[in-house]
Amino acid sequence: MRHSLAEERREGARLDAGEAPVHGGFAEVKYIILQGDGMADYPLEALGGKTPLEAARTPNMDWLAARGVFGIAHVIPKGFPPGSDVGNMSIMGYDPAVYHTGRSPLEAASMGVALGPKDIAFRCNLVTLGGGSGGETYMEDFTAGHISTEEAAEIIRDIADKLGGDGIEFFPGVSYRHLMVWRNGKEKMITTPPHDITDQKVAGYMPTGDGADKLMQLMEASRPILGDHPVNKKRQAEGHRPATTIWLWGQGRAPALPSLTKRFGIKGGVISAVDIIHGLGVYAGLARIDVPGITGFLDTNYKGKGEYGVKSLEKNDLVFIHVEATDEAGHMGDVEKKIQAIEDFDGKVVGTVLTGMAHRKDWRVLLMPDHPTAITLKTHVADPVPFVLYSAEEPRHNGAMGYNEKDAVKTGVVAKQAFKLMEALIEGRQTWTET
């Protein structure tokens, strides 16, 4: 497969040789963003004080760290929640303080759901709530046992039939991740991401503020529908967790982002199993690249992501390759699974890309996560993350480096505003200074 891809790339290069240069003379340069979602973390006692990135075997990311601009980046601006919407907006080169309006409008764009200027999009999770010994209710599982997309679609269709109307619309997504739109709705209420409150009592995290009563009404009304749903009965019979309620959060209006083509004169694509990443791609002007077998979980087609990413560069200038499994393992609080996901990302995605691009001299990489997902907390945190800017045209010689938090800090290189890294990638900077 690698040989045939290389042959195809060489053929594509010959065909494109006569094309006019674009984006300020960088015509033949290819740009690759490699994003291992949430793979940064804190030192863990179970790993002898190492982080999962330190404990994992990552020869390909280490190779990049030894040859690129390597340091730590502040991806999440002060005052923003450490969500994937904020983090990936930064990585794609947009200042969240200017452009961020909420998470769910991005997911709506990915799903092809149009939003009017007064429409509010909400993430609609299918979750499992559990009962404590004292009668309280807690967030048992924000993924409803990683419910399948097919099962979830059946549930969301029934929710839409029974709870939709009067400006409320439901749209099925992937696994536990779905969408609700409130036409001419309200957005100023406070909502809580369910992945932030795993194993906690939900009473203190219900929606509050103007419009919260509508959300509460919908969430409560979903419980009897799901309690008697045939999909849940089948899941329980098979030993799986049921989806016991919908959980609404992450609201916002449609943002206005200038495309990367307009900003830099480049065209590109996005590879991800997650709607929010594709939604950002829609607003950034990046095409969706479909890869068979990608799931957003530990069983995803890692190698396919790398292969399709390399192949896409025959026609495109840039590819953004996102892997969700590292984040999911962090939310599970599973050290071994997170290390495995990191190693799979390194070997099957990063390694495949490095091999596929090895015959070229004119390509650049930005490697980083969007935020840490802390094993001990089972949620996102806003701490800075390790990043690498690598240029095959002008590789650096940093000595032996491991792609991890500790070695990144040792370099003394700090990107205080991570959204500026995209510009540095396009320009091919070999040093990092921030004005």
Where are these regions (language model features)?
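Feature captures the catalytic ectodomains and active-site-proximal regions of enzymes
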Residues: 10, 16-435
